[in-house]
């Protein structure tokens, strides 16, 4: 099992949206970065756990947990001219983009803002808090995962 942090804008698709989906499950589409695509396609597996991170909001931070519940598969939204994430260069015979299905696990007892994550020495090496790392999905080590779960309980 691997751990991930997956970013989404809460006004577009936040943890509340995922929780409200049938069975709390939806596809995580719209990835249009090759490095992130490779992580999805080559490394994500059912059973992996993910932190749901709210980005482009004030303050950005971790809102809760979800689980990867499918094998990676072709992101069909790339082929649909009416879709938000349409990619006119994408070809169904040679697909570029992949996605996975995710299932809501739970909201955190308290929201953990990015500024608080940055203050923790045990998270100093976490990709999220390093300058210049703006990827929408990134791996999380087991130690980082456990530290964040412990932070959730502080002051809750």
Locate the predicted segments by residue:
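A short secondary-structure junction signal
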Residues: 16-17, 78-79, 113-115, 148-151
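Short, surface-exposed beta-edge/turn micro-motifs
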Residues: 1-3, 46-49, 63, 97, ...
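Aromatic- and Lys/Arg-enriched surface recognition patch
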Residues: 64-135
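Compositionally biased, charged N-terminal/linker segments
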Residues: 1-46, 144-145, 152-156
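Short, charged beta-turn/beta-strand-edge "cap" motif at the junction between a beta-strand
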Residues: 53-60
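Hydrophobic beta-strand signal
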Residues: 51-52, 67
């Amino acid at each position: 099992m691997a751990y991930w942090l997956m970013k989404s804008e809460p006004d577009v698709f936040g943890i509340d949206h995922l929780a409200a989906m049938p069975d709390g499950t939806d596809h995580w589409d719209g990835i249009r970065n090759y490095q992130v695509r490779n992580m999805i396609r080559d490394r994500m597996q059912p059973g992996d756990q993910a932190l749901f991170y709210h980005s482009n909001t004030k303050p950005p931070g971790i809102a809760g947990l979800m689980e990867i519940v499918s094998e990676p598969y072709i992101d069909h939204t790339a082929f649909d001219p009416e879709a938000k994430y349409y990619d006119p260069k994408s070809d169904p015979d040679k697909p570029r983009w992949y996605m996975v299905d995710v299932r809501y696990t739970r909201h955190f007892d308290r929201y953990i803002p990015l500024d608080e994550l940055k203050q923790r020495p045990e998270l100093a090496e976490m990709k999220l808090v390093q300058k210049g790392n703006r990827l929408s999905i990134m791996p999380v080590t087991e130690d980082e995962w456990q530290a964040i779960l412990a932070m959730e309980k502080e002051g809750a």
